[in-house]
Curated annotation (Swiss-Prot):
It is an enzyme of class 2 (transferase). The lineage of its organism: Eukaryota, Discoba, Euglenozoa, Kinetoplastea, Metakinetoplastina. Its cofactor is Mg(2+); K(+). Its EC number is 2.7.1.40. The gene is PYK. This is Pyruvate kinase. It holds the Pfam family PK_C. Mg(2+) binds at residues 240, 264.
Length: 498
C-alpha cells in the first residue's frame, strides 16, 4: 500500500522495530574536567562523539592546549576523524564586583544599575555596576533586565544619566560578574572582544576545525569573526537573541552553519517561543543545506544522574525530527558524573528517532523548495539521493577533496550512510558535523595518486564492508568526477557489491 502522508507512515511504526543501525546525527561534546583525559575521550569517541567542543568562557590556554592534544591523540589511536570546535566567550554583559560576596536582591525593592566605574568593585544590594556603557540608551522604561541567566528579573522604572532605577520582581542572590540579558534591546556590542581575538589567534595556531561564534546578531558579525581568525575556518553562528532571529536569513547565508543556543535564547525570548524559533531556524537551514546544531540542556539531568528524564529524551528526539544535523552536550560531558553514559543515551535516542522519519517525504520537501535550474553538481547529488529510494541502495559513496559534494548529498537527507573518501585530513574533520557522513582518509602516499578513481571507490567499499554497512549482493550509489575532471562531481553510478 502506498503511503500518502506522514500520519499514515506513523501508524505503521512499531515499538519492537530495531533502531537505525547507523546514526545520521552527529554528536558534539563539551570537554572539561570529567572528560579531558585520553582514556575518557576514547570512550566518548567509541560511544559516539564526533566533535570536541572547548568552551572559552572558562579555562586557560594551557588547559585548552591539553584538550586539543588529548583529543588528537585519542582520535589517532582509534583511527577516526574527530573535529575540534572553539566556542567563543562572545560580547557578554556582566555585573561588577560585590565586596560582600553574595548579595540578596529582595522582591519589590528598588535597585540601581550604573555604568559609573566608581562602583565597578563596590556593588551592593542597592546599587551595582554593569559593564555595558550604552545600556542606558537601549533599555526603555518598563523594559526587563535579566540577571544571572534570568533568575533575577528587574523592571526599569527610571533612567537618569548613568543610572537605571529598577524594581526587583523576585528575590534572588547574586555575586560577582553575573551575566545580564536585555530582551528586545538593540545591543551594539562588537562581535569580537579583545579576549575573543586572542582566543581566535590561539585557535588558528592550533588549526581548530570550527569556531562557534557566540551572540551573533547580524551577518557582518559572522564576517568579523572569520577575519579575526585570520585564515580559512568554518564559522557556526550561535543564535541567542532577538536580533539574531530577526536577521536569521542573512546570518544563514554568511555562516557555515547555525547553532540554536537555547540557553541565552530562552532568557532573551520567552521560553515557550524557543520552540517556534528552533523549528523555524532548523527548517530554514535544511532548505538551503546549512548545518544546524541544537544545544543546551538536552540531557541535563545526566550531569548528576545515570539516566535521562523522559522529557529530555523527547527533547532530543524532537530536535532530530525538527531537522538538527547535530545535537550538543554541554555540562553533561564537561563536568558531569556520567559523560560516557550520556553519549551512549544520546546516540541511542537519535537511532531510535531515525526510524520514525519518512525519508522520502523529507527528500521531496527539500527538493521542491529549490530554485531551478540547479547547478550541475547539486543536480547530480540530489539525483544520487533519489536513486537510493529507487534502487534500495545501502549507501552513497562520495569522492571529495573539498567536502562540497558530500555536503550537497547530505542536504537531501538520504536514509543511508554517506561514505566520503578524501585525500585531505582537514576535510575528513570538517565532515564531522555533516549529517550522515562517514569520512575516510585516502592516503596518497600509501594508495597512489588521488586521480586513481577506482582505488578511491574501492577504499570506500572496503570500509563499508568492514563496518557492516553493506555486503555482497547489495547495491551502492557512487558520486564522483570523471577521470579528467577534478573538484566537480559530474557522475553517478550504481555498483553491485562483490
Amino acid at each position: 500500500m502506498m503511503r500518502k502522508s506522514q500520519l499514515q507512515f506513523n501508524t505503521e511504526l512499531r515499538v519492537h522495530h530495531p533502531p537505525a543501525l547507523f546514526r545520521s546525527n552527529k554528536i558534539i561534546c563539551t570537554i572539561g574536567p570529567s572528560s579531558q583525559s585520553v582514556e575518557v575521550l576514547k570512550d566518548l569517541m567509541k560511544a559516539g562523539l564526533n566533535v570536541a567542543r572547548m568552551n572559552f568562557s572558562h579555562g586557560t590556554y594551557e588547559y585548552h592546549q591539553k584538550t586539543i592534544d588529548n583529543v588528537r591523540k585519542a582520535a589517532s589511536e582509534l583511527g577516526i576523524h574527530v573535529g575540534i570546535a572553539l566556542d567563543t566567550k562572545g560580547p557578554e554583559i556582566r555585573t561588577g564586583l560585590f565586596p560582600a560576596g553574595d548579595v540578596v536582591i529582595e522582591a519589590h525593592k528598588t535597585v540601581i544599575l550604573t555604568t559609573d566605574e566608581t562602583f565597578k568593585e563596590k556593588g551592593t544590594a542597592e546599587k551595582f555596576y554593569v559593564d555595558y556603557m550604552n545600556i542606558t540608551k537601549v533599555v526603555p522604561v518598563g523594559g526587563h533586565i535579566f540577571v544571572d541567566d534570568g533568575l533575577l528579573d528587574l523592571i526599569v522604572v527610571k533612567i537618569s544619566g548613568k543610572d537605571i532605577e529598577c524594581v526587583a520582581q523576585n528575590t534572588h542572590t547574586i555575586s560577582n560578574r553575573k551575566g545580564i540579558n536585555l530582551p528586545n534591546a538593540d545591543v551594539d556590542l562588537p562581535a569580537v572582544s579583545e579576549k575573543d581575538l586572542m582566543d581566535l589567534q590561539f585557535g588558528a595556531k592550533n588549526r581548530v576545525d570550527f569556531v562557534f561564534a557566540s551572540f551573533i546578531r547580524n551577518a557582518d558579525q559572522v564576517n568579523e569573526v572569520r577575519q579575526a581568525f585570520g585564515g580559512k575556518i568554518a564559522v557556526i553562528a550561535k543564535i541567542e537573541n532577538y536580533q539574531g532571529i530577526d536577521n536569521i536569513d542573512a546570518i544563514i547565508d554568511a555562516a557555515d552553519g547555525i547553532m540554536v543556543a537555547r540557553g541565552d535564547l530562552g532568557v532573551e525570548i520567552p521560553a515557550e517561543k524557543v520552540v517556534i524559533a528552533q523549528k523555524m531556524i532548523m527548517s530554514k537551514c535544511n532548505k538551503v543545506g546549512k548545518t544546524v546544531i541544537c544545544a543546551t540542556q538536552m540531557l541535563d539531568s545526566m550531569t548528576h544522574g545515570p539516566r535521562p528524564t523522559r522529557a529530555e529524551v523527547s527533547d532530543v528526539a524532537k530536535s532530530v525530527l525538527d531537522g538538527a544535523d547535530c545535537v550538543m552536550l554541554s555540562g553533561e560531558t564537561a563536568k558531569g558524573k556520567y559523560p560516557v553514559e550520556t553519549v551512549v543515551y544520546m546516540s541511542r535516542i537519535c537511532c531510535e528517532t531515525q526510524v520514525t522519519m519518512w525519508n522520502m517525504a523529507a527528500f521531496e520537501a527539500i527538493k521542491n523548495l529549490q530554485s531551478f535550474p540547479l547547478i550541475p553538481e547539486e543536480a547530480i547529488c540530489s539525483s544520487a539521493v533519489n536513486s537510493i529510494f529507487e534502487l534500495h541502495a545501502k549507501a552513497i559513496l562520495v569522492l571529495t577533496n573539498t567536502g562540497r559534494s558530500a555536503h550537497m548529498v547530505s542536504k537531501y537527507r538520504p536514509p543511508v550512510p554517506i561514505i566520503c573518501a578524501s585525500q585531505e585530513l582537514d576535510v575528513c574533520r570538517l565532515l564531522s558535523i555533516t549529517r550522515g557522513t562517514i569520512p575516510v582518509y585516502y592516503d596518497t602516499e600509501k594508495l597512489g595518486p588521488d586521480y586513481d578513481r577506482e582505488k578511491r571507490v574501492g577504499l570506500a567499499i572496503d570500509v563499508g564492508k568492514q563496518m557492516g554497512v553493506f555486503k555482497e549482493g547489495d547495491v551502492v550509489v557512487a558520486v564522483h568526477a570523471d577521470h579528467h575532471t577534478k573538484g566537480f562531481a559530474n557522475q553517478i553510478r550504481a555498483i553491485y557489491i562483490k
